Structure formats: structure tokens, C-alpha cells
């Protein structure tokens, strides 16, 4: 019975909503894979323009497979427009190779925005300087320039979910209330 209870707690925690923000993504298969990841993890995906591809691009749909119509995805003309529409209490974390603070030194919470830059350039330097206290790094060997964008998003998103899957909690997402009340 204890195993079932832990399993139920883990499932309930998977109803937590995080926001994945891709700023000017360039490579369709990366975005498609991240869309699929967002769906699987229950996260909302935000695409900040300009995009390096069309949403109906065949390789984007192929990477997202037949899931694309189910993905909670929103397009924004700029990061500023997204930030203006976001909940004012929301926390934003900016993933970059240009900081020493590892992602595991952060306590993630429901509703956090995990922000990632373009595959070739990352996030704008001005954005990183403005939000230096919220910049996070995924540590890697010095000989590696960077990780694949979809890999980075997966690492960050599932670390955030892992942190919130520990212990008993009531999800803030109303769609998940039925799951937690059936425990």
C-alpha cells in the first residue's frame, strides 16, 4: 500500500505546470522535440519570435509527431510581450553557459518560467546582465561548447519536476485536483 501511495504522489506532482520559453529558436527538430517533451511533462511551451522556421514546417511536425495539436504552445512577438502577460509573481530562470551557478542550486516552484536562447547564440547578453541573479548553468566538461537545446530543456524541466515530486503536496493546477483527491 505504501508503494501505491508514493506512486500516487509522484503522479500528482506531474500535474505541476512549468513554462518553457524558447527565445528565437532556429532548428525545427529541436523545437519539435521540446514540444513533445512539454506535452509529456505537462508544461506550457512559449515560442518567442522571430522563429527560424514556419510552425507548419514538416520537420517540426515530424519531431513532434502526431502530438503537435495537443501541445499547449503559445507564440509571442517578443519576450517583453510574454512577460507582460505572465503572472506578476512568476519567477523567471535564464539558462546559459555564461554563468557559474548550477541549476541544482535553485529551488524551483509551480509556475516558474525556464527560458532558453537560440541554438547558435543563446540568450542576449543584455538579458543575462539584467537578470544575472536568475541565470543558471548546466555544468559540463570544459571541452564541450554547449548541449543540444532539447537536451538542456529536458534536464532543466525534469529537475524542476523532481524537486516538486518529493513529499505530499496539493497541486495548484485545478485540472489535477481530481488526481490528488483520489489518494
Task: Specify the residue positions occupied by each region the protein language model found.
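Post-transcriptional modification and biogenesis factors for structured RNAs
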Residues: 1-183
Amino acid at each position: 500500500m505504501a508503494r501505491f501511495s508514493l506512486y500516487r504522489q509522484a503522479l500528482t506532482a506531474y500535474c505541476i505546470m512549468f513554462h518553457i520559453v524558447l527565445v528565437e529558436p532556429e532548428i525545427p527538430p529541436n523545437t519539435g522535440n521540446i514540444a513533445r517533451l512539454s506535452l509529456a511533462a505537462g508544461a506550457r511551451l512559449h515560442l518567442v519570435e522571430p522563429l527560424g522556421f514556419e510552425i507548419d514546417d514538416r520537420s517540426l511536425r515530424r519531431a513532434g509527431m502526431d502530438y503537435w495539436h495537443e501541445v499547449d504552445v503559445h507564440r509571442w512577438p517578443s519576450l517583453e510581450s510574454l512577460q507582460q502577460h505572465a503572472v506578476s509573481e512568476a519567477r523567471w530562470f535564464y539558462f546559459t553557459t555564461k554563468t557559474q551557478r548550477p541549476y541544482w542550486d535553485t529551488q524551483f516552484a509551480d509556475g516558474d518560467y525556464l527560458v532558453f536562447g537560440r541554438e547558435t547564440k543563446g540568450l542576449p547578453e543584455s538579458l543575462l546582465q539584467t537578470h544575472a541573479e536568475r541565470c543558471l548553468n548546466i555544468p559540463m566538461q570544459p571541452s564541450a561548447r554547449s548541449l543540444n537545446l532539447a537536451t538542456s530543456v529536458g534536464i532543466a524541466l525534469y529537475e524542476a519536476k523532481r524537486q516538486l515530486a518529493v513529499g505530499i503536496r496539493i497541486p495548484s493546477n485545478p485540472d489535477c485536483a481530481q488526481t490528488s483527491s483520489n489518494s
